[in-house]
Amino acid sequence: MAAVNAHRRLRGPYTFGGALLRVLVTEALERSPGLADRYDIEIDAVLPGMRERAPGRRRPIDATLPEDERILVPAPRRTLRLANGIAELALAVMPEGVSLVADNVHEADPTDLELLQVLSRRLPGVTVVMVEASSAPADVIASDGTTGDPEAWAAYEALDPAVRKELHDRRAAELGWEEMLGALPWHLERGSDPAAAVEALWAAVDRCVGEGFLHAVVDLGQRGLALSEAGSPDWWRFAQRTATALGGLGRRSEALVVYDQARRTSLDPAVHASSAYGTAMLDARHPDPAQRDLGRATAWINEAIAISTILPDPRERAFKLGFDQNGKALIELRQGRLDAALDLVESAIALADELPDGAHPLHRMVLHANRAQLLATLGHPKEALHDLDRAIAYDPAVPDHYLDRGNLRLRLGHTDAALADYETAIAVSPPLPEAYYNRGELRLGQGDLEGAKADFDHVIDLDPGFLNAYVNRAGILEMLDDHEAARADVVAGLALDPRNPHLHAVLGQLETAQGDHAAAMAAFDVALEGAPGLASIWANRGILRYESGDPTGAVADLTRSLELDENAAVYFNRAVAHRALGREETAREDLRRACDLDPDDPDIRHALGS
């Protein structure tokens, strides 16, 4: 495969990824048409012009809805799923020994940089080369502004402005859908028709929002703002999407600037309501609880609700008021007021029922999913399941709702149904680490160590930063006596979270097995500092204390473990410690209780007999 110019100015997000995917899809179609269909979501997102060749089977409903009903913005991690899907197609069709060369990577969109990292990690037989040098033509117009040749740029700047505009217009007329996120708006911005540029920028923003290309939304949105009259409807469309993307990327102060600018330039009540809502969510959704000012968030969301309540159009009022009430429900939830949160969501559902039949299905879907979470937390799992069923019915292509329903079914003991939900989530989504992780936990709970380990292996392949996968895999490896691999996972996990109590608990077991009692004790101490309510850590430290010649300390730790969770093995171990202290009758009491809990254990029966 020839070197690919990865400059985002060519085709925007996935400039490199689109070129690669075109080759992969062509190869997949030659081998087996069904193979390409398995990656329909990735093809739709990265190379939509090929969807007719690989029509696929998974189609979310948002593509069929009008603009004002497409309310969902994918999380930033969606692009990691897409990158892994492309990598898995490459694994299926790309021969070993191939080199992939991307140049102009210093100007690549973050989606391509992420993809290149995933390909480097997941394709061991393929060489991925990234360079900053440019293979673009040494002409500004012909290269779509990607050339790095200073002489070409000097010649371009020396052109008569009218000639420059005409050249940009001509080049824009030659471009099509492949360049709609990159070269097309770039040329139109510099051509003679500003209205066409605004239209092209909006089309690009709208598509990038739907796909979750948030960095591109910010770039394109800011360019659209610069070409639009402040306070105009076009300006607000760009402003709202730009601020939303900035918030999703964690750039909250920049998002706040956009919302403040909207408040200063608009007299439209709906704009003020939406700006107040967006400002409230910057606090309510902050990933660090310590950084959330929920009082300030409440003030802003109350303003949004107050304005939405008096909007004159009944349909707009029913939607926006319900939308704002759902936002306030999140703030109430963050403050532990679950009943108040539930009341707000139910009020929003009642408002949605006032909308015309079929209107705003995504809004209704979100409301039922949110009510399900609240009902489950409040101890109403059957009602929660009903709401999740309704959410899934609105759009069966949303994987997160299958995960939520699977978790709830597992909690209710419906293991087979939970497994089916996890596997459906896997089927309807690009590679989804959370779905494999949840299935791995289910398999671990069933005692299927090899199956669970395979799932956790895949989670770490998909996302090397998935901490809990290291925790669980390390525990499995320790149980399988693969101490070297378990220690490697502990080290990798502690690099992500140096004080993680679960990893220190596994480390304590590994050090105990190696005979380093001092290191084991230190590890268990750290684990208990972080998770004092975890019975297994107290039990393992109790065993260590007994083996270190401290039966009194062992009894204390084992007693604390039993206070947290009755367990036959822990009663047995405490009986052994009591016997070492000469407390025969107390030991026998523990053995009898152990036998009650596990009457078939031969070690317990033998100890009672002796």
Please report, for each region that a protein language model flagged, where it lies by residue.
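Sensor-1/coupling segment of RecA-like P-loop NTPase cores
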Residues: 97-102, 107-143
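Flexible helix-coil transition and linker loops at the boundaries of alpha-helical arrays
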Residues: 188-191, 226-235, 264-272, 305-319, ...
